[in-house]
Amino acid sequence: MHKKDKEVTDKQVIEEILTKSEICRIAIHDTEYPYIVPLNYGYCDNTLYFHSATIGKKLDLIRINNKVCFEIEYSSQIIQHEESCKWTTNYLSLIGFGEIEIIDDTFDKKKGLDIIMSHYGKTTNNVYNDTQINNLVIFKLPITGLTAKRSGNGDN
């Protein structure tokens, strides 16, 4: 990281970013340009989980090359100032890497959905019928590396 004073190494802060943020963006390799997609996600045991339709560009690209980069930001706030060039943003963010796996097993798909649902607050009584399970894809992304950053106080 270029600005070491902004680097976050505290594992508790990194866990907070991973567990409290709402959107994760994944960047997937495409032929000429990267393809980036914002996704709902769940986080458990150093692994991110996503759901998707069974067809589409994202899925096609992942099947070709499952190495991805992801970005998550948390607690961002624009700080205004009388002088235009002194405007800034307070935030916590992280950028990570990994290789996405497509989960095929029905039991593991339900487990992935439970992790996603729990991330957004529904921790019990999740029921999924076979049609729903068969009409979606669950991705599992074990995190192989990441860096975290704080700009400003980052705890708005």
Q: Where do the PLM segments sit?
A:
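A short mixed-secondary-structure module that forms the rim of ligand-binding clefts
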Residues: 42-77
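Well-ordered beta-strand positions
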Residues: 40-42, 63, 132, 142
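Broad gene-expression machinery/nucleic-acid interaction feature
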Residues: 23, 36-38, 67, 91, ...
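Extreme N-terminal tail/first-helix region
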Residues: 1-19
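A generic structural signal for nonpolar/aromatic side chains embedded in well-ordered alpha-helices
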Residues: 17-18, 61-62, 116
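Short Pro/Gly-enriched beta-strand edge/turn motifs at strand-loop
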Residues: 20-23, 122-124
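Charged, gly/pro-rich active-site loop segments
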Residues: 2-5, 75-156
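Short beta-strand segments
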Residues: 21-54
